[in-house]
């Protein structure tokens, strides 16, 4: 996640440009709604509110500290900014609840939203709070929860998961070559004393990963910490649930944007957007079958990256991959709330 407290968010102007395609589209309502699904410190939301003075921005975040900071930062916009604490795949519940509270116009149910941004992964604000346990450079409790009220911590994973479960997490979520070896070391060391703080884990990783790999593969803790964070916060599950759910809220012409920082996230986004933007007409037919046309089209050619100039100013922009798409057909658009079977 790109938000840097006190600094310009990654690719801010490009995000405004992409979301603006939906806000300014001919199908946008007079009071368009933008969802900033990963609010952080509020930098992208602030850019949207400044750029589109007729729009309402809904900021979602599971981290109450982020919500408090963003609410203070964006108070000057009054009722044009509303926030809600949730995992980002809870967007439908959030929008419904905000409409019930009168903080969003009820017409959003019918018209949908004009754009959204999801800036995935851990925020710079969270990395800069060592007590949260996200950063391996500072000794801190092995927590890693984006929502401090969630039950699962990184320490619990290390102390209670089986060897096979730990190895799977490190391999799948961290692409760690030495996942099995690290898992064996964790199980062996936790029998002596449970894991509590990050420094001990970092020390174990230095001792376990061969020196040659440490010299060429970046910091030895990077992949393990990433994998633990993804497991603690169920990040990939949330993302997989999110994409079809948020897509149903887009009106024709509205634009959705995802910013990814890990290949796992980007692969999930890429696969989903390709499926959404592909016609259901069987290949080989000379015409598009009615009702089988693609609901969406891609608005970026592949994955866009930050410019060299921006990366030079902000190294955290280096890994970002941006993918955007827009609705071109009302075929799959849903009016919420969904009917529930009796």
Curated annotation (Swiss-Prot):
Q: Please list the residues that bind S-adenosyl-L-methionine.
A: 42-44, 61, 88, 119, 126
Q: What class of enzyme is it?
A: transferase
Q: Name one GO molecular function term.
A: rRNA (cytosine-N4-)-methyltransferase activity
Q: Which GO terms describe its biological process?
A: rRNA base methylation
Keyword Mitochondrion attributed? no
Chief subcellular site? cytoplasm
Taxonomy, superkingdom = Bacteria
HAMAP family given in the database record: 16SrRNA_methyltr_H
Q: What is this protein called?
A: Ribosomal RNA small subunit methyltransferase H
Q: Which organism is it from?
A: Corynebacterium jeikeium (strain K411)
């Amino acid at each position: 996640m790109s938000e840097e407290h006190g600094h310009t968010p990654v690719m801010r102007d490009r995000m405004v440009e992409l979301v603006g395609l939906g806000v300014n589209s001919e199908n946008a309502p007079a009071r368009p709604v933008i969802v900033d699904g990963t609010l952080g410190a509020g930098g992208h939301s602030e850019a949207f509110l400044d750029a589109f003075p007729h729009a309402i921005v809904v900021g979602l975040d599971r981290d109450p500290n982020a919500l408090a900071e963003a609410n203070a930062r964006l108070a000057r916009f009054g009722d044009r900014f509303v926030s809600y604490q949730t995992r980002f795949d809870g967007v439908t519940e959030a929008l419904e609840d905000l409409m019930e509270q009168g903080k969003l116009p009820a017409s959003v149910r019918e018209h949908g939203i004009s754009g959204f941004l999801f800036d995935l992964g851990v925020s710079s604000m969270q990395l800069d709070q060592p007590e949260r346990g996200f950063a391996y450079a500072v000794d801190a409790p092995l927590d890693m929860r984006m929502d401090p009220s969630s039950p699962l911590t990184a320490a619990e994973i290390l102390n209670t998961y089986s060897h096979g479960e730990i190895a799977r997490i490190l391999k799948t979520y961290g692409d760690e070559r030495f996942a099995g070896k690290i898992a064996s070391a964790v199980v062996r060391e936790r029998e002596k004393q449970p894991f509590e703080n990050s420094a001990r884990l970092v020390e174990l990783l230095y001792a376990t990963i061969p020196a040659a790999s440490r010299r060429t593969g970046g910091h030895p803790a990077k992949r393990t910490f990433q994998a633990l964070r993804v497991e603690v916060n169920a990040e990939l599950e949330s993302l997989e649930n999110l994409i079809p759910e948020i897509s149903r809220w887009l009106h024709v012409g509205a634009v959705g944007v995802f910013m990814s920082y890990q290949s796992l996230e980007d692969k999930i986004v890429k696969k989903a957007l390709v499926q959404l933007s592909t016609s259901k007409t069987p290949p080989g037919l000379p015409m598009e079958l009615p009702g089988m046309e693609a609901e969406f089209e891609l608005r970026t050619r592949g994955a866009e990256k930050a410019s060299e100039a921006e990366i030079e100013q902000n190294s955290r922009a280096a890994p970002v991959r941006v993918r955007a798409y827009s609705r071109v057909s009302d075929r799959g658009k849903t009016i919420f709330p969904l009917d529930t079977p009796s």
